[in-house]
Amino acid sequence: VNMDDYVKDQVRSKLIRVKCMNLMAKEKGVVLSRTQKDAVSSAADTFFNALTQEQVSALNVTKDQIEKMFTEFAIADTLYDDVTSQINTEVSSDDARVITIQYICAGSKSDISSAKERLDNGESFYSVAKDFGGEEESETECKRGEMEQAFETAAFNLKTGETSSIVEAGGKYYIIRCTSDNEKSKTEANKTALMDEKKLEYFNSVFESYEASKYVEMNKKVWNSKKTANTAELPVSFETIFNELVK
């Protein structure tokens, strides 16, 4: 698959999903509020007025068509919020916790025991880790679910400044030092991301069978004639305007 076909497939899938979401919204009686309609109108004005006459001609688009597109995306967004409002998306602060650690990694028990002995004798964690990790500083941020379970358990049980005993995980041996047991701003961001993941997972479980039951026909002749390489760069972004004025 070449890049042109890949991009077009992504756009096609997005447009089909939005169309199907609008069908579901109609069946569920989901409509835009007056405030949302005003926001859509403002977004369409902003987008259309930013285009030159040459760009309007090249796109072969009218203001009404642009407003219809903003409307359909707004309805899809409203449906998503309506469906996902029915579930509990709460994520605990501990589940979302982001920590920062340093670690020493060795391929054998004897090597990691040697590293531990050096630490016990007062050498700095950084200097020992550097010897085992080459020039790279073995420091990283960690979230739950990203590491081997034994490594994760040991890392998340540490408080800031604490060092673990020897941990075996994935066929290797580690000593872990916690430099921060809670990166608070990143924990909050991760909490939001995990809640969004829960929403998307639930929505997909509800929507995908519905979408599969619908047949959306596209004008293949027109669609196949479109090439992303021939698309001129526009002074405005549909997605940016939608997120700023409508979402």
Predicted segments with their positions:
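N-terminal targeting/tethering segments
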Residues: 1-61
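Hydrophobic (often cysteine-bearing) scaffold residues that line and stabilize catalytic clefts
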Residues: 4, 8, 12-13, 17, ...
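Short, well-ordered alpha-helical segments enriched in acidic and aromatic residues
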Residues: 125-134
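Short helix-loop boundary/capping segments
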Residues: 139-141
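PPIase-associated folding chaperone regions across multiple families
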Residues: 55-117, 130, 149-247
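Residue-level recognition of oxygen-bearing side chains
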Residues: 20, 111, 124
